[in-house]
């Protein structure tokens, strides 16, 4: 299913470049007791990449993104209450190896990226993290995930983390991000206060949001969390700050498309309570 999203929280349509984002869900990816089913997750990611790149096979899509000669940093997220699932890290690494990237030229890291030789010498990055609300940024999504690439993260917390887009212009990451994967297996849709976590506001959405444009991926993710708040509370209950950094990344830093009207959202798989 293909949809063009409405304006939502992020602005009005204008005649400018568009972006493509794939949302894929599978009601079986969280098995008994919420355990991630690795092979189902692999098939979800593969189908998303194939659809995003318009290729005949998943591996052909991966080969459009990465070369065997690349040095690849997988920028994950280790926040203890809702980290990137290790199964998702594993299936990403599996496909990089399948493309022919040497094992020694692949690493997965979060808070140690500035001291990690693979990341410091990376020719390509893959950005992967869970979708959740965030005290300083409104939402914790792909743009926010690169805050560990600076030695002073707190300096980027002003005005709803509006300066986050600037990090993407620094040489350590500029132009290197080949794919953004927002893990929406169990997103957190509401929270107030620093490091807030409450399982009442986490739900088994069982999805992945995938794209080459981090701004568009984040805009879709923020829209999903907003839609869930409306469904849960009967209104869009306010966060500590609105996720204005997504629009700033578009308007000021020109990193991608924040306008939901200019995002082609391709929805695959399980459609029950898809919300957007």
Positions of the model-derived regions?
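N-terminal and secondary-structure boundary signal
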Residues: 1-276
